[in-house]
Design a protein with these regions (language model features):
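Catalytic cores of nucleotide-sugar-dependent glycosyltransferases that transfer UDP/GDP/TDP-activated
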Residues: 1-416
């Protein structure tokens, strides 16, 4: 059949069978494939660039593989369900709808193309949503093909779901389709430390944060310092990184602050490796040199124009000895070999005293949920799906989480 696959086991709990699909053989057939989708579904692929073409072809190839698997490995009595996540896999759903309609197709979106565009471009999403015309927005942000695939998949699916009530509202407006079901996100609690391990892991994570802070500054920090963090993708406004930094600036100006605060921004960005002065100080803490960069663990590309660094400067967070709040930017993936921490993210998370995720656009929000799983108190907002879920299911204050009300235009209030 010309399908190129590799079959193995996914290295997660349960070790499920996984099929890796190579879609590259379909690149030369892309015009015929997209023409067929236009004729059957009016899917508008004409303006799609490679960031549309490649995922669409992957989805198509995945649909072909599912068709082949069902034909050769299932009986007529078996009920087969294929679940497609996000617009990037939607072409597979469309292929199966016509080629093998007996397969039940679920389409799950974890955000919307237009919602992410609006929020990411500093436009008011929630207060103005009903005034936005989806077709005009798609043209404005040059995402006509992505929007078309997302909308078409939602309408053609046998069951359309999303991860939160707040995203269900987006779907109804931008995709002109009510979801059939809201399926809140979650995870198997198999990667959190056991009761016996927790104390040791927390101590190791905390010690690492203190060591790195001292190595960056070239001077000691308080042993009882409050360690605070934010993490996630580098979406400056959507993830509330701007609000986090503003809050640290306000906290630093609070004369009543009695404890030193070490604030870590764990957000991957372009960088050129670990800061050598920092590494020297980690190796030889008693011969510490004063770093030329008091914020960064790694050499950040274009630091002068970086939004995080510019916001830190604007808040006059200088990391001087007099400052009660010290803020650090870790622009590296924390997978155990970043060159500075050399510990996986979760082994560091457990060492924090508090996390804060003051999100503006967050269809669900795993990060505060992960914090709770690791027994770290957390802060989120009512614009995060998880935050809304907590508000709905807990009528009283929860000891581990604070959900701050957030809406369009109130970033300064949220920071306060």
């Amino acid at each position: 059949e010309g399908l190129r696959i590799k079959v193995g086991r996914w290295n997660v709990a349960g070790k499920p069978i996984v099929i890796l699909v190579d879609f590259s053989t379909f690149i030369t057939q892309k015009d015929e494939i997209f023409a067929s989708f236009w004729e059957k579904y009016k899917l508008d692929s004409i303006s799609g660039q490679w960031d549309y073409i490649e995922p669409a072809l992957f989805g198509y190839a995945a649909g072909k593989v599912i068709e082949s698997f069902v034909r050769f490995n299932s009986s007529i009595r078996q009920r087969i369900i294929a679940q497609f996540h996000e617009w990037m896999t939607g072409a597979g759903l469309l292929y199966l709808k016509s080629a093998m309609p007996q397969v039940g197709c679920v389409f799950t979106t974890h955000a919307t193309v237009l919602g992410r565009c609006v929020a990411g471009n500093n436009l008011p999403l929630y207060s103005e949503m009903k005034n936005y015309v989806p077709e005009e927005l798609a043209r404005r942000f040059n995402v006509i093909s992505k929007q078309s695939l997302e909308k078409t998949a939602a309408h053609q699916a046998d069951c359309f779901t999303t991860v939160s009530e707040i995203t269900a509202t987006e779907c109804a407006h931008f995709l002109d389709k009510e979801v059939d079901l809201v399926t809140p996100n979650g995870f198997e609690n198999v990667f959190t430390p056991s009761e016996a391990e927790w104390e040791g892991k927390r101590k190791a994570g905390r010690e690492k944060f203190l060591q790195v802070a001292q190595a960056i500054l070239g001077r000691p920090v308080a042993e009882d310092a409050l360690i605070l963090g934010i993490s996630g993708r580098y979406e400056f406004k959507n993830k509330g990184i701007d609000v986090f930094i503003d809050a640290m600036g306000q906290l630093n100006r609070n004369n009543g602050l009695g404890k030193e605060v070490l604030a870590f921004i764990l957000v991957p960005a372009g960088h050129a490796g670990a800061n050598k002065e920092l590494l020297h100080n980690l190796e030889l803490p008693y011969q510490a040199v004063t770093s030329t960069d008091l914020y960064l663990t790694h050499y950040l590309n274009d630091s002068a124009n970086d939004p995080v660094m510019n916001r830190i400067r604007a808040q006059k967070l200088r990391n001087s000895e007099e400052d009660k709040v010290k803020i650090f930017f870790v622009p590296s993936y924390l997978n155990g070999d970043d060159g500075v921490f050399n510990m996986p993210y979760y082994d560091l998370l457990v060492g924090m005293d508090l996390t804060a995720f003051p999100s503006y656009y967050e269809p669900w929000g795993y990060t505060p949920l992960e914090s709770l799983a690791f027994k770290v108190p957390t802060i989120t907002t009512t614009l995060a799906g998880f935050g809304l879920w907590v508000k709905e299911h807990y009528n009283m204050n929860h000891p581990g989480i604070e959900v701050i009300h957030r809406e369009d235009g109130d970033a300064s209030n949220v920071a306060t």
